């Protein structure tokens, strides 16, 4: 069973589209493809209704594109009308959000892999030590999203066994 926290939420999609700086046409293509071909990756609440998903993502994109003054004004208005719900939940699993972004980049940006040293990945999340529990959480996120890790030479590896200074490549799982 894949946990809901490893499913794409409107926030994840909006962050990807914002960082990608895609055209409106490309945004619609990505949303449409996600809904039609990767529906199982979307959180349950948005699976049956494409327009609900699209509206939620576009509302978030509109907020992300505001400047500071406009953002604070919009935030105040939203608080006044109490339009704060499940979409504003803060995700506590930083690895889930990070690997969901990588999944979207690998699926839609035309790149076939992302590479990083495990030491840098841990440093970016402010971890000083590599514990078994931490590696298991990372591994769970990778497996839930269908991401595989490789060393140089396309050699499969498990994140728990990789060395800190090994260059790790993250790729989409190939379907057979």
PLM region spans:
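Short glycine-rich, basic-tinged beta-strand/loop micro-motifs
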Residues: 31, 108-129
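Charge-rich, solvent-exposed alpha-helical interaction surfaces
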Residues: 12-18, 29-37, 56-60, 73-80, ...
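Charge-enriched amphipathic alpha-helical scaffolds
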Residues: 37-64, 122-159
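Long, low-complexity, charged/polar intrinsically disordered regions in eukaryotic proteins
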Residues: 43-94
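An N-terminal amphipathic alpha-helical segment
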Residues: 88-116
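Charged, low-complexity interaction regions
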Residues: 18-29, 39-47, 65-68
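Short capping segments at the starts of secondary-structure elements
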Residues: 8, 18-27, 111-116
